[in-house]
Every structure is written in C-alpha cells, then in structure tokens.
C-alpha cells in the first residue's frame, strides 16, 4: 500500500509540473526597428516574433529596418555630431557585446562621435 501511495504522489507531482510549465508562456521574442535620424522602436519579451516586429515598427517613425532578437540583446548607435548620418546596430547574446558592436559599426560607417541611442534585451539576453 505504501508503494502505491508513493507512486501516485510521484505521478501527481509530475502531472502538476507538466501543467505548470505548459501554462506559463515563454516570452523570448524581441525586435528593434531602426529608421533615419535616430528614429527607432523597440519591443521585447513578446510571445511571438511577428508581434514584436509589429510593435517595434509602430514605435519607429518613417521607413524603418527591423532586426529581431530571441534570447539576445540589440543595440543602436548613432553619430552624435550628425544624427542623420552614420549609425550602427547589432544583435548579440550579451548586452555588452551588442553595445560594443553597434558602436564599432557606427564608427565603421563614418561616425565621428558615436553614442548608444537605444538598446533592449529580451527574456534571456
């Protein structure tokens, strides 16, 4: 009888665990929309990539390029002396890497005083 009770407890615990993990959605989709003259929009921790893209585009004015991230970080750097000029953006696993890479790309494209304009990390970034 004790073995039967122990087996039922294990089965009940397993069922509760399965239900608990199935009910909680994994929000790990993000997007950043990058436009001209420092325009941007960002969305992070969305359940679906399409929803994140849509939200980021709605926040960005003008014609914007969209980059996506999943369990990562995105950053946008612009030239402070000419915000409508050089810029750079990056998506990396860690925030420090995305900040550094976006800044490097801004300088690579001719920026003179590149600064971070925006950054975002999703659930695991």
Predicted segments, located by residue:
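Serine/threonine-rich, low-complexity intrinsically disordered segments
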Residues: 7, 23-26
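Bacterial N-terminal signal peptides that target proteins for export
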Residues: 1-13
């Amino acid at each position: 009888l004790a073995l039967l009770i122990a087996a039922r407890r294990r089965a009940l615990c397993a069922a509760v665990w399965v239900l608990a993990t199935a009910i909680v959605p994994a929000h790990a989709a993000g997007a950043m929309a990058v436009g001209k003259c420092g325009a941007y929009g960002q969305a992070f921790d969305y359940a679906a990539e399409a929803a994140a893209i849509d939200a980021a585009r709605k926040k960005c004015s003008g014609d914007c390029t969209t980059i996506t991230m999943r369990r990562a970080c995105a950053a946008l750097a612009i030239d402070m002396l000419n915000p409508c000029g050089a810029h750079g953006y990056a998506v990396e696993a860690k925030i420090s890497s995305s900040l550094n890479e976006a800044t490097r790309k801004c300088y690579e494209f001719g920026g003179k005083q590149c600064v971070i304009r925006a950054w975002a990390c999703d659930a695991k970034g």
